[in-house]
Structure formats: C-alpha cells, structure tokens
Amino acid sequence: MSKEKFERTKPHVNVGTIGHVDHGKTTLTAAITTVLAKTYGGAARAFDQIDNAPEEKARGITINTSHVEYDTPTRHYAHVDCPGHADYVKNMITGAAQMDGAILVVAATDGPMPQTREHILLGRQVGVPYIIVFLNKCDMVDDEELLELVEMEVRELLSQYDFPGDDTPIVRGSALKALEGDAEWEAKILELAGFLDSYIPEPERAIDKPFLLPIEDVFSISGRGTVVTGRVERGIIKVGEEVEIVGIKETQKSTCTGVEMFRKLLDEGRAGENVGVLLRGIKREEIERGQVLAKPGTIKPHTKFESEVYILSKDEGGRHTPFFKGYRPQFYFRTTDVTGTIELPEGVEMVMPGDNIKMVVTLIHPIAMDDGLRFAIREGGRTVGAGVVAKVLS
C-alpha cells in the first residue's frame, strides 16, 4: 500500500502531442504508455483505445480528446491527444487541456507540413511554454542527410515562432516499431521520456502564484463591512494582508479583515477554495462582480489585446451566419461580460462559424488580465466563441 502513497507525491506535469495529421501522434501516445509501462510500471493503452476519443464539453464547445497517464521514475504525466485538427485548435484555445509542454510529432518521410506550422503558431499564441520534437517514421528513411535536412527545417520553423529552435531536443524514432516491441526503437521512447523530465521544468503550482480571486458576489454585513465571495484562482490570502480591487473601475486598495468558508472563520483562503473575504473601508456600491481581488501590483486592468479565437460552428450551437468588421459582441472574462469591438487581420473581410482567427479586441471597460487569460465570446448570454489573450496591448 505504501507504494501507492509514494506515487502521489511525484510532481504532476501536463503534456500533449501536436503535429500534422497522420504523422503519428496517436501511435506515439500509445507507444509512450506501452514502453513506460513495460519499463517503470503503469498501464499501457492501445492505439484504438486512444484513437476512439470521447467527446467532452469545454465552455460550451464539443471537443474530442483522449487523456492518458504515465509515469517516469521522477514524475507523473497527464497526456492529451486529439484525433482531429479542429479538436486541437479548440483544445488549445479553450485551455481545456492546459499544457506545460508539448511533443511535436513530425514524420521524417514528409518533413514539416501546414498543420505542423499551425500547431507551433497556436502553441506560441496560447502560451505552450516548451516544445520537444519527436521525428517519427525514421525507420523508413535510410538517408542520414535527409534526416538532418528535416531536423534543420523543424528547428527553423520553431525559431520563426520564437521557440528556441537551436536548443530544442529532437528525438529520432519510430512510434510503430516501438509499439511493436523492437528494442532499438523502444530506447528512443525512453530517450523522449528523459527529455520530458529534463527539458520541461516543474510547473509552478497555483498555490505558489500571487493571490487572485475573481469576485462573484458582494454582500454588506451590518456591523462588519463588505464581503466579496468567489473561488480563489491562485495563491493564498491571509487575514491582515493588503489587496487591490482591479478592473472595471479605478483600482482601489483595501485590507482583508477576515476570511470565511462555510460560515467558519479562517486565517487564510487558498487556491481552489470558495471563500468570503471581508474588506476594510469599502462600501457595497464601490465594488462589483467582474472585478478581481489581487495581491497589490501583480495584475493590471487592460482594454486592448491581441487574441486567438475559435468561432463555434452552427452544429455546436454557434452562429448560423458569418460576422464582419464592426461586430460588437460581449467578451466573458472569469465572472462577467464586457462589450468590445474587434479588428480583423488585414485581408480578412468576414469570419465564418467554425473558423479560428487572430483578432484585436478593444473592451469598453478595463478588465484585470495577463497574457494567457481565457474568455468566451457571447451574444445575449449565448456562447458563440472561445478565445485566449495572446498579447496585452494597452
């Protein structure tokens, strides 16, 4: 029994396979689970178990995703693999499967293809911090020079999108041969697992980040003052600490004079907990849903940003018609809707349901935001799109 307990203490890292259709992402996913299970213990997953991905909903969007888990001696990995290109786009934009690092699969027989480029760009836009390359199907290429050429192309492509192409680990392998139990190629899977361990740093846990709580509700308690409620997104709030109230209006400062959960008074509220925070010297009408409480100086309000968005198709309950420049929907951040205007990329006249597109958004009120913040696009309470802040502009 003691072993089970030990497993849980390993750092947990989220990864996924990305890359062009038919380059071997799902075969590689199966090979990793199989080879690591054989070497270090754990459950192997067959190709067809992974390929038959269940549907799930994230922000009202249907995404097909397979989740597998595996262990190396030092870490526990949760790995996501998507069957279709559209699923990757949706997954990365909604953040349904947030990745601490990605394995880019490139077939040595083809070299980089259009979706290879698109997935690298998406990775950059949505903040995938690290990419490791698995050069697949190397058993089918005899020419060493050809492999070097493909490797060089991949490095150039990564550098083009601000990943460190020259320093990126590239493993030459064959997922299929490894899956079939060929020892020479199994060794390449272990080499890849070694890079997952060494190249992707341990992710910072939510509790170690600066305090932030999106405000859901505001109450006034006679004799005690104003209480805001919500779920702590990150960090810890302790009684007596200063906080800032950010977004929508001018930023204000206050002090937390109490934290409560389930009607009990606590010394602190931590990431993941639903709490009420009592604020000193703030009137009920000076604060509203949609603002955030944050550690002073850690987050600023912004109105203009570059984003990567996915527009729901008609089948997903989205719009039935395209939209054009001048479109003014609501952008739903954390707990509230804010109206905004959009600028489309040069040469783009209209956006169709089912498209993914880069757009610059200008909100009518400032919202507390950082790069990587997810949002929904809504019309009258109905979700018509999902997006991520790629870059705050002002």
Swiss-Prot record:
Single GO MF annotation: GTPase activity
Region (G4): 136-139
Keyword Acetylation: yes
Superkingdom field: Bacteria
Region G3: start-end pairs: 81-84
Binding residue positions for Mg(2+): T26
Chief subcellular location: cytoplasm
Catalytic activity: GTP + H2O = GDP + phosphate + H(+)
Phenotype for F262A: Still associates with EF-Ts, very little Qbeta viral RNA polymerase complex forms
Keywords: Acetylation, Antibiotic resistance, Cell inner membrane, Cell membrane, Cytoplasm, Elongation factor, GTP-binding, Hydrolase, Magnesium, Membrane, Metal-binding, Methylation, Nucleotide-binding, Phosphoprotein, Protein biosynthesis, RNA-binding
Modified residues (N6,N6-dimethyllysine): K57
Phosphothreonine carried by residues: T383
Post-translational modification: The N-terminus is blocked.
Consequence recorded when altering D139N: Reduces affinity for GDP; increases affinity for XDP
Phenotypic consequence of R378A: 60% loss of Qbeta viral RNA polymerase elongation activity
GO (cellular component) term, any one: guanyl-nucleotide exchange factor complex
Transmembrane segments: none
Region entry G5, spans: 174-176
Subcellular compartments: Cytoplasm; Cell inner membrane
UniProt record similarity statement: Belongs to the TRAFAC class translation factor GTPase superfamily. Classic translation factor GTPase family. EF-Tu/EF-1A subfamily.
Function recorded in the entry: GTP hydrolase that promotes the GTP-dependent binding of aminoacyl-tRNA to the A-site of ribosomes during protein biosynthesis. May play an important regulatory role in cell growth and in the bacterial response to nutrient deprivation.
Protein name, as recorded: Elongation factor Tu 2
Originating organism: Escherichia coli (strain K12)
Gene: tufB
